[in-house]
Structure formats: C-alpha cells, structure tokens
Swiss-Prot record:
It catalyses: (E)-caffeoyl-CoA + S-adenosyl-L-methionine = (E)-feruloyl-CoA + S-adenosyl-L-homocysteine + H(+). S-adenosyl-L-methionine binds at residues 63, 85, 87-88, 93, 111, 140, 165. The keyword S-adenosyl-L-methionine applies. Its cofactor is a divalent metal cation. It comes from Populus trichocarpa (Western balsam poplar). This is Caffeoyl-CoA O-methyltransferase 1. A divalent metal cation binds at residues 163, 189-190. The keyword Metal-binding applies. Pathway: Aromatic compound metabolism; phenylpropanoid biosynthesis. Keywords: Lignin biosynthesis, Metal-binding, Methyltransferase, S-adenosyl-L-methionine, Transferase. Methylates caffeoyl-CoA to feruloyl-CoA and 5-hydroxyferuloyl-CoA to sinapoyl-CoA. Plays a role in the synthesis of feruloylated polysaccharides. Involved in the reinforcement of the plant cell wall. Also involved in the responding to wounding or pathogen challenge by the increased formation of cell wall-bound ferulic acid polymers. Its EC number is 2.1.1.104.
Length: 247
C-alpha cells in the first residue's frame, strides 16, 4: 500500500489542470518518450521549426513532436501522395507530411492566417519541400464545397489531416468523406481535447478548452456511428482519430 508521501509524489507527477498538451499522467514519462525516441530522430528542419514555433505566443496550437513523428511514419506506411491539411499554423505537421510524401507528392494546405504559415515557411523552403505545398489562405469550407461541386476531386486524396476550428469538424467531415479515396485516411486532431472529454463539469479548464469540448464530444460520437469509415482513436499528442473510408 502506498504511503501518504508516495501518494503525494504520485499526484505531483500528474497534470493538475485539464488543458495540458500531453495526455500522459506523468510529465517524466512523456519527457522520456521525447528524449529517447522522438528528439534523437527528429529531422533538423523539424527541430528548427519547432524551436521557431516555441517563441510564438500561441505555440500551444502546434502539433507535438511525437505526433509529428507519428504522422511522418503513417504517411510512409500508406504510401500517401495526394494529401490535404486543414489548419496549418506555422507548419510543423505540414513539414512532417512534406518530408514523408514522394518528390511529386502534393499537399493542399488551408489556413485562415497566412502570417503564421510564413513564420515557418523559410524553414520549409530550406528543407527543399515547399514545391509540394499549395497554400490557400481563408476558410476551408468554401474551398471544399467548390471541389465537391466540380466533381474532379471526388475520392482523390490519400490522406487528409484536420487540426483547425473544432466547431466545424462535423462540417469538415461531411465534405471530406467525399474527397478522400476508399481506403484513404482522414486524421482528426485533438479528439481527446486535453483530456476534457472525460472531465466532470466542474473540472478546472481553460476557457477555450471548455468552449470547444462539446464540439469534440459531438464529433467523436458522430465518427463512432458513421458506417462509411473504420476508426481508431489514439492517445498521441492531444488525441488523434484516424478514419479509414471503406465505402
């Protein structure tokens, strides 16, 4: 049986506030993962972009290094070539994707803020992968609607990554399911939303966590009930749900 001192030490190693980026109970364990298998294998350009992003006031928005590593390997495993990213920020996950896809691969990248993207663009250019990226500034929904209306892009994407406005995730899914190919993947980021999905109503949460929590819960329920996809929810980063289109 644990002593009071051991219990206090255990609690001290856990995240006390809902809203922490990592979902692991122990900061030390997460640091072990980063220092043992993530940082030593992180490409120099991704390390540089991560360090640039860390200086930005909204750096909590970036994809975590372990998730970037996961995405990079996943894209190689599925041989993704034609991809899409909704929500770019400074481009850490975008760079992970660009490094993974072949030389003639393409990424349609959309974000409402070009300024953030341009913060990381010099690093992406130096890495020699900027030619793979077609960046569009502005809301993604009108672009998706146009693509569906044109009909040329139906079932054409191998992989789509969404890390944007959580209150529109359901709206994105309604459109993306038509654009991803059968057998292709859609990855929705933040689906465990800082652990708030299981938090009691009176749990301490940052305002933005509390605001978007219900939208994330709605998405998770909708994905679980969608017969057109197979799903797998992974506790990587802030939670990512992979959806494989089967019909």
């Amino acid at each position: 049986m644990a002593t009071n001192g051991e219990e206090q030490q255990s609690q001290a190693g856990r995240h006390q506030e809902v809203g922490h980026k990592s979902l692991l109970q122990s900061d030390a364990l997460y640091q072990y993962i980063l220092e043992t298998s993530v940082y030593p294998r992180e490409p120099e350009c991704m390390k540089e972009l991560r360090e640039v992003t860390a200086k930005h006031p909204w750096n909590i928005m970036t994809t975590s290094a372990d998730e970037g590593q996961f995405l990079n390997m996943l894209l190689k495993l599925v041989n993704a070539k034609n991809t899409m990213e909704i929500g770019v920020y400074t481009g850490y996950s975008l760079l992970a994707t660009a490094l993974a896809i072949p030389e003639d691969g393409k990424i349609l990248a959309m974000d409402i803020n070009r300024e953030n993207y341009e913060l990381g663009l010099p690093v992406i250019q130096k890495a020699g992968v900027a030619h793979k990226i077609d960046f569009k500034e502005g809301p993604a929904l009108p672009v998706l609607d146009q693509m569906i209306e044109d009909g040329k892009c139906h079932g054409s994407f191998d992989f789509i990554f969404v890390d944007a406005d959580k209150d529109n995730y359901i709206n994105y899914h309604k459109r993306l399911i038509e654009l991803v190919k059968v057998g292709g993947l859609i990855g929705y980021d933040n689906t465990l939303w800082n652990g708030s999905v299981v938090a009691p109503p009176d749990a301490p949460m940052r305002k933005y966590v509390r605001y978007y929590r219900d939208f994330v819960l709605e998405l998770n329920k909708a994905l679980a009930a969608d017969p057109r996809i197979e799903i797998c929810m992974l506790p990587v980063g802030d939670g990512i749900t992979l959806c494989r289109r089967i019909q």
